[in-house]
């Protein structure tokens, strides 16, 4: 899917906060959760997400989703990663201080 089409689909589905992210090789983010849903399209490179002990790698052309409140860890591949991400606030979790 082309990034322009992906961005249109994000907006259609209520993912109003959209940005292109570029993360450096080897970057790691410890387990955390967000107060919003995430949908992302990998444009280049690789990112690995670990949820409940299961790790999955996403590469160019792959789409990943992360519902609000799901704890996960992130690990960027050896060449970094470039992806287009949309965030959709969820009313029940948007103001929950435990979901950061």
Give short role names for the model-derived ranges.
Residues 1-20, 30, 96-100:
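A short, N-terminal "cap"/entry segment at the start of jelly-roll beta-barrel domains
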Residues 7, 28-34, 51, 75-76:
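Short histidine-centered beta-strand/loop micro-motifs
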Residues 17-34, 68:
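Conserved short histidine dyad/triad with adjacent acidic residue
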Residues 22, 33-49:
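Short, conserved beta-strand element in jelly-roll/cupin
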Residues 25, 44-48, 55, 89-92:
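Short, charged/polar surface micro-motifs in flexible loops or helix N-caps
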Residues 52-68:
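Short acidic-glycine-tyrosine-enriched beta hairpin
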Residues 68-93:
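Ligand-binding loop in jelly-roll beta-barrel domains
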């Amino acid at each position: 899917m082309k990034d322009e089409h992906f961005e249109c689909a994000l907006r259609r589905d209520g993912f109003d906060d959209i940005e292109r992210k570029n993360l450096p090789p080897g970057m790691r983010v410890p387990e955390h959760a967000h107060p919003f849903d995430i949908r992302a399209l990998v444009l280049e490179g690789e990112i690995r997400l670990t949820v409940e002990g299961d790790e999955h790698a996403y590469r160019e052309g792959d789409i990943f989703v992360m519902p609000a409140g799901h704890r996960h860890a992130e690990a960027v591949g050896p060449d970094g990663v470039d992806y287009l991400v949309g965030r959709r606030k969820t009313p029940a979790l948007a103001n929950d201080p435990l979901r950061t």
